[in-house]
Amino acid sequence: MKNLTHLQRLEAEAIYVFREVAATFSNPVMLYSVGKDSSVMLHLAMKAFYPAPPPFPFLHVDTTWKFREMIEFRDAQAREKGFELLVHVNEQGVRDGIGPFTHGSNVHTHIMKTVGLRQALDKYRFDAAFGGARRDEEKSRAKERIFSFRNAQHGWDPKNQRPEMWKIYNTRVSKGESIRVFPLSNWTELDIWQYILQENIPIVPLYFAARRPVVERDGMLIMVDDDRMKLRPGEPVENRLVRFRTLGCYPLTGAIPSSAANLSDIVEEMLIARTSERQGRAIDRDEAGSMEKKKREGYF
């Protein structure tokens, strides 16, 4: 038996996790945020159950502020791959006019993402939800298990996690409780890009460098994606060569100057990167420990 490469080991672990959840939970779902990690997750899920389709639906929590290219890519992938796509919007948040400009990143994220996700999980009664979080992304995620227990209110208690020795997972939950499952926990950002290159996985074009209209605000390059973008007095819009390392709501996601226009260029760029991909996410700057607080409340 030949020795597995690093990427093959990561792939095998993720596929094992997918199959374990399918075998032990009655109503799982995959959270599909449309980013690079979600694209890798989709690819792995298709592999795990081939030639059958994944035995669970894909859930996208739409904040109504995602990049337009993300929504176009999401719908195109659903048509091409033929998976069941569920889209949920917190309609009460829409009626209340919640948005990143009017209410700030913290309130917007809580109402439109966290509360929206909890609504969808309750509506469809999912008992397990796959997510694309990785331990190298952020310190609160670094201490989270692959199988992350959530109580009936979808809350996470980092001091009450289940042991995962020898790849043996405790999948038992009581009524109303659930598990968030992270098959990519042991992957790094570089692993993700090398796997995307190796497998030729389709991704949102925003990850590739192109000239885009951006404004420099609070140390971030924010792309002007539609006419809802509120410019400050004297704030110029510049067409700059940029790409995104991470994707989310466009007013809360910063681009980076880059000329990496293909996958090989991105991998080369990642080999010398010395900053976190989440430096471009405004939601991580809300307050100290903000990500852990969000996760305790039921965030992805």
Swiss-Prot record:
Keywords: ATP-binding, Nucleotide-binding, Nucleotidyltransferase, Transferase. One of its GO terms (biological process) is hydrogen sulfide biosynthetic process. GO terms for molecular function: ATP binding; sulfate adenylyltransferase (ATP) activity. The keyword Membrane does not apply. Pathway: Sulfur metabolism; hydrogen sulfide biosynthesis; sulfite from sulfate: step 1/3. The keyword Chloroplast does not apply. InterPro entries: PAPS_reduct_dom (IPR002500), Rossmann-like_a/b/a_fold (IPR014729), SO4_adenylTrfase_ssu (IPR011784), Sulfate_adenylyltrnsfr_sub2 (IPR050128). It is an enzyme of class 2 (transferase). Residues 281-300 are annotated as: Disordered. It comes from the Bacteria. Its EC number is 2.7.7.4. It catalyses: sulfate + ATP + H(+) = adenosine 5'-phosphosulfate + diphosphate. Gene3D superfamilies: HUPs. With CysN forms the ATP sulfurylase (ATPS) that catalyzes the adenylation of sulfate producing adenosine 5'-phosphosulfate (APS) and diphosphate, the first enzymatic step in sulfur assimilation pathway. APS synthesis involves the formation of a high-energy phosphoric-sulfuric acid anhydride bond driven by GTP hydrolysis by CysN coupled to ATP hydrolysis by CysD. Belongs to the PAPS reductase family. CysD subfamily. Heterodimer composed of CysD, the smaller subunit, and CysN. This is Sulfate adenylyltransferase subunit 2.
